[in-house]
Amino acid sequence: MLRGIEIRGKVDKNVKSILTEECLTFLGELERRFGGIRKNLLQKRLDRQIDINNGILPSFLKDSDCKRATDKNWKCSSVPLEIQDRRVEITGPTDRKMVINALNSGAKVFMADFEDANCPNWENSIHGQQNMIDANNRTISFTSAEGRKYELNKQVAVLFVRPRGWHLNEDHLAIDGLSMSGSLFDFGCYIFHNHQILKNRNSNPYFYLPKMESHLEARLWNDVFVFSQNYLGMPIGTIKATVLIETILASFEMDEILYELRDHSAGLNCGRWDYIFSFIKKFQSYPDKMLPDRAKVTMTSPFMDSYVKLLIYTCHKRGVHAMGGMAAQIPIKNNEQANNAAMEKVRLDKQREVRAGHDGTWVAHPALIPIAMEQFNTHMKSQNQISYIPSSTAPNFEEIAKSLLSVDPVKPGDITEDGFRSNIVVGILYLEAWLNGNGCVPIHNLMEDAATAEISRSQIWQWIKHKAPLPDGKSFVTLQYYNRIFKEESDKLEKAHPNSKTLTDAIQIFNNLIVSPNFIDFLTPSCYKFVVDSERKTFSPKL
């Protein structure tokens, strides 16, 4: 093995085909050049959280070292023709059958997800990379246990890839004794193996970038792009990336984020569910910023509506796509009335997005594509509506800052026992699926990823901390209230799924997240440790 590079996962023919000596050398370069900067930025996140807990609220940057809204002259570089029209995009994990179905779905773009819709066990990570290579080579196929064969159509969606966020490690690969960045691993493997394939097809590498909290984190991605393009002999600007604005802090730095990535930008996306989670997390210490039941927080909530409007204005001012958020509904079988109601919600949501000025939107299931497509085809006659700027004058940023942070105080009835129980059940069920290797899970007729579990557990933690009012107006959410309902719901789940170790582990992880005196930033690292420890019991690492 190369000096200082250690594979800590099982080494088989699949691993060897991805982690070649040349690829490992490239990954080592990425980690050694950028890993330290990443860790410094993660420390800045912790420092920022302390400031917020101490009363220093987020605001727009007054003295940023990159041009902001006050400079109207710059625009991001143009994107290739094949991604000018992104009116409907489908997202999903990187397993072989899902990749084929998504590429064949009729959507304009498929975002293959190594992040929230993926459990990054070693097999998923390696097989996912191979599936990307085969997809770009147009050779990917799959035969089910029943003998059904899946192959690509002649016309397929454009492929985007979402690597893991900056906060996640790849524990199966160590550089100089330390786990590599999950972001750099996912990105590095993909760009190394696919850049030439894409060039040969007159296409480009496209990415979605998650979970950023500042323009400095966008600057790091840009530096990674520039280095990688130089290393691999690609012209600067070949890589294009859409940033998910899914943290409250990033919403105050959208202009700066676009500026940092201006040669590589393919716009911004409203990552609505993680945005809600981020709002709860960042304002964990603020009783006046608690949110009601998860189901009651919608895109028409004033703080969410302000975020959407600012994103569209900022993107179009800078000449890039403003992408709408996820519709997580899935078809409801054997209940036509419920299914029709669910599909009508999707229709209205997509109509709202396109009328607001979005250039495209996300769906989680192929059945939603015609519904979303109809709304965008009806209300957006051109490839996009980037030329539409919602206001002819610059917005009042002082007022926007207030609206981004403003929520109505929680009152009796906003938090219900049904909503409380739902958070517990959904959180545990998602964690159990994740521990079993599935990051994208159908629960209660919605396709859920990690964001839903994050909202569920963070709401409960915050409600307990601030003794949120219950519907009777006399009692409040307490640890004792949680313990009672948690025991009832976990007992039901264990009775329905006896002798399930992963369910027992999921219940333990969920409870640990709730009873921790300090808010735990992300739930996936806790789960990841279980996964890695379980894997290491079955093999001896190859050094």
Curated annotation (Swiss-Prot):
Pathway: Carbohydrate metabolism; glyoxylate cycle; (S)-malate from isocitrate: step 2/2. It is an enzyme of class 2 (transferase). Keywords: Glyoxylate bypass, Transferase, Tricarboxylic acid cycle. Its EC number is 2.3.3.9. The keyword Protein transport does not apply. Disulfide bonds: none annotated. One of its GO terms (biological process) is tricarboxylic acid cycle. GO terms for molecular function: malate synthase activity. InterPro entries: Malate_synth_C_sf, Malate_synth_sf, Malate_synthA, Malate_synthase_CS, Malate_synthase_TIM, MS_C, MS_N, MS_N_TIM-barrel_dom. It catalyses: glyoxylate + acetyl-CoA + H2O = (S)-malate + CoA + H(+). PANTHER family: MALATE SYNTHASE (PTHR42902), MALATE SYNTHASE 1-RELATED (PTHR42902:SF1). Belongs to the malate synthase family. This is Malate synthase. It comes from Dictyostelium discoideum (Social amoeba).
